A protein has these predicted regions:
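N-terminal amphipathic alpha-helix/helix-capping segment at the start of soluble metabolic enzymes
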Residues: 1-24
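Active-site-adjacent beta->alpha loops and helix N-cap segments on the catalytic face
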Residues: 3, 32, 55-63, 83-92, ...
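Hydrophobic faces of well-ordered beta-strands that scaffold small-molecule active sites
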Residues: 19-25, 45-49, 77-83, 101-103, ...
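N-terminal glycine-rich phosphate/pyrophosphate-binding loops that anchor nucleotide-derived ligands
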Residues: 22-38
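Active-site cofactor/substrate anionic-group-binding motifs, chiefly glycine-
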Residues: 41-94
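Expand to "…catalyze enediolate/carbanion chemistry for C-C bond making/breaking, isomerization
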Residues: 95, 139
């Protein structure tokens, strides 16, 4: 069908009283399997491009893979950059066509992470893309 935005997928799922599933992609084989299974169950999906995949495949090729798979199915696919470590990788993903970004600045100080998160938020607004941020961690004392 097509590449879509996370906002649209979530709105459609809510209207249909349905769900959206996200899968971390490691390569062609699992990406195509995820899409095939989603197509069979008529479930729109998020294909997540994490750091592991990006070590072995350029972002442009990852997006091209997601785009090709979207043309071979009846479902909608959200291309998602997972754990983008800095502004540049997030911008590059948006320039290529990713519609959803997860910025992970958790290794920075809280203040620096928050400032970077706000800059990336402003960037995603220009692209009409969704943003998820990792601001830190939760600790539980037992």
């Amino acid at each position: 069908m097509s590449i879509d935005s996370l906002t649209n997928l979530l709105n459609c799922a809510k209207t249909r009283n349905n769900y959206v599933v996200g899968f971390v992609v490691q390569g062609w084989e699992d990406a195509s399997s995820f899409v095939r299974a989603a197509d069979e169950t008529e479930t729109d999906i998020i294909l997540q491009s994490g750091p592991g995949l990006r070590k072995n495949m350029p972002l442009e090729l990852i997006y091209a893979m997601f785009e090709k798979l979207s043309g071979e199915t009846n479902i909608k696919i959200v291309p998602h950059l997972d754990h983008g470590e800095n502004y540049d990788i997030c911008k590059k993903a948006l320039d290529i066509g990713f519609t959803s970004i997860m910025y992970d600045g958790s290794k920075l100080s809280f203040k620096e992470n928050l400032n970077q998160s706000l800059k990336i938020y402003e960037l995603t607004q220009k692209y009409n893309a969704c943003l998820e941020v990792e601001l830190g961690f939760l600790a539980i004392m037992i």
